[in-house]
């Protein structure tokens, strides 16, 4: 039996099942094996199988910034229920992003396998500001010149129905802009929204195809609103929320596919029903045998798992490096030591900032090598100084760049204390929106869960 007959004797479903267990980089290479394999790997059946398998085993994605250099790792998320109060897991290296000269860290977000870096200066030559869309699982990224004015912040949204990624840039006094990734005619498009509601500085969050962000009412300073942007239909909606409630928010979160607000407050009362004037308060006190909470760590909130576990991690690299999972329903805390992250370098000695993203899944969305430019509305920009062979027009340049692993970075500054720090788990309060249907802004109700750590 020759090789071709052996392959033909294997059922296609079995071949796809085997291939779906491979890393994304390997699948990308296997497209070149033959036309048959390329067709199989590009089929909707294989894409669905791969995404479902990846979603059933989500990982923790870690981005470590050392000077201007980013390194990306991932590690398994623990299964629930916990058999132990502490675990050790190994991290896998994905890529190193060496072309970044400087990055404003407040503009970093994650959506379905992609990382969005809003304000970045690329390479050592020049000072050209770009946005970067990075895919750690394949080692690829886009460098995109932003619209002008570039806006106070932007975010990456994902349309789960149309399977499209879009970048939204929000401005205070000008139109907003949006860019759809992967289309044949990539360009920034201006979109209209009410100038009455202006976005605040907090980063948006995308939940089920809707980007949420905190805004304020320019006509009534006592009114605070949450903006809702439908990624698929590119429409804005706004609903009012209690001023004192929004004032204590500094992070919008995804809590079991519902919008949540994460403040650093000791406790909070929440209005459940406006007509009945009904308030509620929920408190969770950690068991006294969880001694890990007494360790003096600078921790930051990084997200919530699909099971409702609240995840906190060290803000800066040090050895050992811990991530904590708190389950408010079971009142349990799990500490996970992540090993193998940058241990071959001086990664732990220079206060490198660590960004952690929960529920990381691999997908087969590929950047197109043939697309090298997009258009920017009504402006001209100088070309970036990125060292790559590609065409650009007078408006904007989009590039597909492979990561470089050999660039050395020696200048490292110590960052200031981030306001998203929780020392000793002093307090954690979670606000959850029960109804996240943006079409009915008058029907929102909130509940509260306050975790007090001893």
UniProtKB/Swiss-Prot annotation:
InterPro entries on file: F-box-assoc_dom_typ3 (IPR013187), F-box-assoc_interact_dom (IPR017451), F-box-like_dom_sf (IPR036047), F-box_dom (IPR001810)
PROSITE patterns in alphabetical order: FBOX (PS50181)
Pfam families: F-box, FBA_3
Annotated F-box domain residues: 4-53
Organism domain of life: Eukaryota
Protein name from the UniProt record: F-box protein At1g67130
Species of the source: Arabidopsis thaliana
């Amino acid at each position: 039996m020759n090789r071709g007959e052996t392959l033909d004797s294997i059922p296609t479903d079995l071949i796809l099942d085997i291939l779906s267990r491979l890393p994304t980089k390997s699948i990308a290479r296997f497209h070149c094996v033959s036309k048959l394999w390329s067709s199989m790997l590009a089929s909707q059946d294989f894409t669905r199988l791969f995404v479902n398998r990846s979603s059933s085993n989500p990982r923790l994605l870690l981005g470590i910034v050392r000077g201007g250099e980013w390194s990306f790792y991932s590690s398994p998320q623990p299964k629930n229920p916990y058999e132990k109060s502490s675990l050790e897991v190994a991290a896998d290296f994905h890529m190193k992003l060496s072309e970044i000269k400087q990055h404003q860290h407040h503009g970093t977000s994650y959506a379905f396998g992609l990382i969005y870096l809003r304000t970045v200066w690329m390479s050592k030559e020049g000072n050209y500001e770009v946005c970067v869309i990075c895919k750690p699982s394949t080692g690829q990224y886009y460098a995109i010149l932003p619209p002008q004015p570039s806006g106070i912040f932007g975010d990456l949204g994902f349309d789960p129905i149309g399977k499209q990624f879009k970048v939204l840039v929000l401005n205070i006094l000008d139109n907003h802009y949006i860019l759809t990734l992967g289309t044949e005619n990539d360009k920034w498009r201006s979109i209209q929204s009410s100038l009455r509601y202006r976005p605040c500085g907090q980063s948006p969050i995308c939940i089920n195809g809707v980007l949420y962000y905190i805004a304020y009412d320019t006509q009534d300073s006592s009114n605070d609103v949450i903006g809702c942007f439908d990624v698929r239909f590119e429409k804005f909606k706004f609903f009012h929320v209690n001023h004192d409630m929004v004032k204590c928010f500094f992070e919008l979160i995804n809590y079991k596919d519902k919008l949540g607000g994460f403040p650093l407050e000791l406790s909070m009362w929440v209005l459940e029903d406006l007509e009945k004037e009904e308030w509620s308060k929920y408190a969770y006190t950690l068991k006294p045998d969880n001694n890990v909470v007494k360790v003096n760590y600078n921790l930051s909130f990084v997200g919530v798992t699909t099971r409702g576990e609240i995840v906190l991690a060290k803000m800066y690299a040090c050895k050992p490096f811990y991530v904590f999972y708190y389950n408010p329903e079971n009142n349990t805390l799990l500490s996970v030591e992540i090993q193998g992250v940058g241990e071959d370098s001086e990664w732990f000695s220079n206060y490198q900032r660590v960004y952690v993203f929960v529920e990381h899944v691999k997908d087969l969305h590929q950047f197109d090598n043939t697309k090298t430019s997009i258009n920017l509305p009504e402006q001209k920009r100088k070309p970036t100084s990125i060292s790559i062979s590609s065409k650009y027009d007078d408006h904007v340049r989009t590039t597909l760049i492979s990561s470089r692993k050999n660039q050395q970075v020696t200048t490292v500054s110590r960052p200031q204390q981030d306001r998203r720090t929780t020392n000793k788990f002093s307090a954690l309060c979670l606000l959850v929106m029960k109804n996240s249907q943006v079409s009915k802004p008058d029907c929102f109700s909130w509940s509260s869960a306050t975790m007090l750590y001893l």
